[in-house]
């Protein structure tokens, strides 16, 4: 089962998940928010103990810089 999680205001939930041992599986997916067409979001596929989890956060310059620091590719979906 895939666990879906949304924290669209900031990336604190993503940082918490990483602290809890979740690992990002690149690429990170960039897309338009289905609920608010004018907003871009990033989806991260996380894994821990053989279980996937999808986290969605707002696309910000700070998040992009952090992704660049990790050297993760970004795939644009729509």
Q: Residue locations for each model-derived region?
A:
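Terminus-proximal functional modules
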Residues: 1-78
